[in-house]
């Protein structure tokens, strides 16, 4: 099934000069770049990219608790309200997204969402396999990010589902051109 997905090379990825390498990896996997731009995200774009919904906030809260439990660490007591926690994380995500120029691109191909996610690797750079974008280029960790009360800097964002890709593409691109 031919799909479109959104990829953002985050500020640390742009600063490290890996834009061409990221694009080359997608193209070597027979994926097409059908939208591409460099942008300094506005507050409005960051809000639209990271909307706080009850479902997202609850999922985030549960994942965070599970992560601490796996490490054998008691999670810090922040709040029992997932929406309050979600809004705090959203503010960190937005701050990071707006901290520098990013590259936004739409990638098209057969099973593009799944293939891009495999090429990108785990969101946790320590768990990302060698040969994935995060495994090769990320140097951050959740432990360090948590200790500094910020989001992890893992160089790249990729939509996690076809539905999420549709929503995110609409945030970043008003028009796409098929050139092939």
Please state what every model-predicted region is.
Residues 1-180:
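Non-catalytic terminal and connector segments of soluble metabolic enzymes
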